[in-house]
Design a protein with these regions (language model features):
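Single conserved hydrophobic/aromatic residue that forms the stacking wall/gate
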Residues: 150-159
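Flexible, compositionally biased loop and terminal segments
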Residues: 1-151
Length: 159
């Protein structure tokens, strides 16, 4: 297809499940932590180029509720990656007009990480460029249960 024949992008939301980074690392004989770090590097590359494709929404599933079953050292490394990502990349994201939102259950997440999440969401709240959602401590089942509770609670209270 010639460049002049390219159609405008109709994709409005890209969702990525960041899975397999630890296995990738193990296959290469490296610690699982290295794979997780490579996953963050890939996310940074994607964030640099996603604007070229005019995709307004990006959701990255980075830590599922099942990840709590992993060894404590691995969980700690994953929390540190989110910490470091926010601390290192927040200003660049903000300067590039990215609106950052972290979705998922905040129970169990260290308080300092929650403060970083809250401050990053607050800082970028008025940005109207890429809408980046990071699903952290997230599961579809949990989301259904929470939605059900929110839908039925008013009914239960009225009875």
């Amino acid at each position: 297809m010639k460049p002049s024949e390219k159609k405008e992008n109709t994709l409005s939301h890209l969702a990525i499940i960041m899975d397999g980074n630890g296995r990738w690392s193990e296959q290469k004989g490296l610690p699982r932590e290295n794979g997780h770090k490579e996953g963050v590097k890939s996310l940074r590359k994607l964030l640099r180029y996603i604007d070229d494709f005019k995709i307004p929404y990006l959701t990255v599933f980075s830590f599922s509720t099942d990840n709590w079953k992993r060894p404590k050292s691995e969980i700690s490394n994953l929390m540190n990656l989110l910490r470091k990502f926010i601390q290192t990349d927040l200003i660049e994201l903000h300067n590039n007009n990215v609106k950052l939102r972290v979705i998922g259950n905040r129970d169990g997440i260290p308080k300092d990480v929650i403060r970083l999440i809250n401050s990053s969401e607050y800082l970028t709240r008025d940005n109207d460029g890429l809408y980046l959602q990071i699903a952290f401590n997230y599961s579809g089942r949990d989301e259904i249960a929470v939605s059900y509770t929110h839908l039925t609670l008013p009914t239960i209270l009225l009875v």
